[in-house]
């Protein structure tokens, strides 16, 4: 099952400040168990990041901010990234430090489609699950 969530800016700020992920575990929800693919996108006017990933079994696990934060940490997000792309007019996909423009896609479907096949060509493989 494919699920889409929003990662709040304050969690990205934690990465920018260099906080360790394991130090945040106490104050954030239980970790989710995930599949092998995921991506992130940011839209103009906010610093929120949209995170999509495939969940192995949604009945047993759920999406939470800590898991999304772990994903974003894999991308080496910097303050420059946040300032540059949050202020941009376009929607981008973030993949291991690379940014791919998604202007040719339907922006409305980015946030509502539970099975966004248009993004299947660009997976984020991280090799771990909780």
Which residue ranges define each predicted feature?
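Structured alpha/beta reader/binder surfaces that contact nucleic acids or chromatin modification marks
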Residues: 1-130
């Amino acid at each position: 099952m494919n699920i889409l969530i929003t990662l709040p800016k304050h969690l990205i700020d934690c990465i920018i400040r260099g906080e360790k992920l394991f130090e945040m575990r106490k104050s954030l929800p239980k970790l989710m168990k995930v599949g092998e693919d995921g991506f992130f996108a940011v839209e103009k006017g906010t610093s929120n990041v949209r995170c999509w990933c495939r969940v192995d079994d949604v009945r047993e696990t759920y999406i939470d901010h800590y898991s999304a934060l772990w994903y974003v940490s894999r991308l080496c997000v910097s303050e420059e990234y946040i300032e540059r792309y949050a202020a941009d007019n376009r929607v981008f996909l973030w993949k291991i430090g690379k940014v791919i423009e998604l202007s040719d896609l339907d922006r409305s479907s980015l946030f509502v489609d539970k099975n966004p096949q248009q993004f299947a060509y660009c997976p984020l493989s991280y090799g771990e699950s909780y």
